Amino acid sequence: MRMLLSSLMISTGLVLAPSPADVPLRGFFPQSVQAERDLEARFKTMPDPAHMRESMRRLSARPHHVGSAYDKDNAEWLLNQFKSYGWDVHIENFDVLFPTPIERVVELVAPTTFKAALQETALPEDPTSNQQSEQLPSYNAYSIDGDVTGPLVFVNYGIPADYEELEQHGISVKGAIVIAKYGGSWRGIKPKVAAEHGAIGCLIYSDPRDDGYANGDVFPKGPMRPAQGVQRGSVADMPVYPGDPLTPGVGATKDAKRLTVAQAATITKIPVLPISYGDAQPLLAALGGPVAPAAWRGGLPITYRLGAGPARVHLRVKSDWSLKTLYDVIARLPGTTEADQWIVRGNHHDAWVNGAEDPISGLVAELEEARALGSLYKQGWRPKRTIIYAAWDGEEPGLLGSTEWAETHADELKAHAVAYLNSDGNGRGFLGVSGSHSLEKFMNGVAVDVEDPESRVSAWKRLQASRIMNGSTEVRHEARDREDLRIGALGSGSDYSSFIDHLGVASLNLGYGGEDDGGIYHSIYDDFYWFTHFSDTSFVYGRALAQTAGVAVLRLANADVLPFAFTNLAETIQTYVKDLQSLRDRRAEQITERNRQIEDGIFKAASDPRDPVTAPQRQQPAPQLNFAPLLNALDSLSHAASRYDKAYSRAVSEGRTAVAKGVNERLVQAERALTSTEGLKNRPWYVHMLYAPGFYTGYGVKTIPGVREAIEQGEWRDADREIARAAAAVEREASLVSGLATTLTGGS
């Protein structure tokens, strides 16, 4: 039925999409357009699904985590591949803190006893699942060592709102070990919030309702997580800073000055360990106390209770805290007329175990792009701008390789980097794009020119159809009526973070997915067998990713005038500001209503006497906030962006080569204008005023983060100050864009 409706909308013309011929090639003079179109047509025929399949088979053949023999072996193989494609390539090394487990114990000691297996089961159908001697055991990297015993408390997803719920039930986690479900936030938030509330240890498990049998057959019969499957992952406090915990802000070179482990701000305060739902079930079943709220209950065949106790758990974690060597593979095609401007493209090569989906499915697409670009280069094509392709090491533990490289080359990147294009895992489904909104119009143009391999419509048209069919009323109307499909904002979670969040380099994150859900994330089952049975089995979406990212790289590298557009940026910021105003009003209303309920004794009167709820603390009323500076700055940017768009269109259509170089040099700095050298409160590594990972969400983005988090946390004095700081960044952007418009119209 769903497929039928999609076909109907497309065939009857209700889903309107531009054809490639209808979309101007943004950034190219009329005399350059046909050559670029011809080049892209040649490029798009080159990425080969068969090559991707064999590259994945080779790269995912053995576990290749940081510090492993196969991690280095893969880096050297990648080096040789780039060389064979005609690229200038080298390996850049960094020495980083990467703890690996020595001891792991989880056991129920009361009221009954049970010892968790902490072992994923090898499966006869899956030929690489039995490489136990090379596999990293299931653990959470950067958990502090510890040996603790205490009562167990179930905390749902372990986010701040869950602790508010527990407090109303009169349940404290002080001196307890908490058990939290994966999901609801990035995993590193769970031990962070638990420690803030006095917990002494943290267990994290994947509930079958989220990615197990409640969603389909489990592996190997189906794609979902089996009972002993465990999600490994880092719990370093990356919202403070990513990368090597011992060298914040500087590259982790051999001679770098390092903090001690005790000084590192991103290492957890309590021991943490991930477990399977098979190991979690006896622990949860032993809990007493109130029945968990309906929204907290998972898919296990037990009564979910909160605790604390009578279950008591013993948790022991001990790791090897030595430095390990990273192997970043850096390849370069030199530019010609604007060689000092760089287009950077990256995907990581390390994995928690075999990592076929994460990250090799994205890496093999990047390799095919590099092979195709190298072939064009050998045939005589030369890019205007220098193209850099990177295969990062150490992404999984904490964006290590990309962060250390970006910090080491920070001054060069600030001077030369036009844009960074990232990918990670890739699968079947719809095109996903997030990134700098000055590149939103540009990426819409790219998406129109790439065909979805299964539906045979453009990637743009298929994404539009999905939003019309599945979106809210607002999303549906906008997908039909807005000229460009919206792209998302970037928080953290992959290798773009250092570029956009720390250096202010315009960035994009690209990938396909949404139609190949699974439950093998960060487990031993993320391997070639799983991917070739349950994901992009024919690798045609790998080809689509290579075409999408490769065309974007070609256009950025070859454009006569860089294809940034600022009207979309201004309009997006306007939606952020409106949302902030609504957030302030909602918070004020919530506080007023909550305080009234406390004063009127509502909590006590409505509470079940047999399961009483404790009234929360009264909060200070929310003051009005002065958004005027931000609104005024936004008006300035909107006006400047409109002027720029008109001047840009005219200058490009007239082929005004005389102004191109000067404009391009200033466009490189456009994203930098949105940063502040002071950085965000309590985390100065993050300098972008529009985008950052949430302090209590992790990967998830907070837009205009200084203001948003001040409102969310009730820090009202900070809110007005952060509004002024955000306004100053938008004013800087407006001034830069206005100056560019003047130059394009013939001014100085």
Describe the function of each predicted region:
Residues 130-165, 240-357, 371, 375-379:
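Soluble metallo-hydrolase cores and metallopeptidase-like ectodomains found primarily
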Residues 38-46, 60-69, 138-143, 177-184, ...:
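Second-shell loop/turn segments in exported
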Residues 208, 329, 345-399, 404, ...:
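Alpha-helical metal-binding/catalytic segments enriched in His/Glu/Asp
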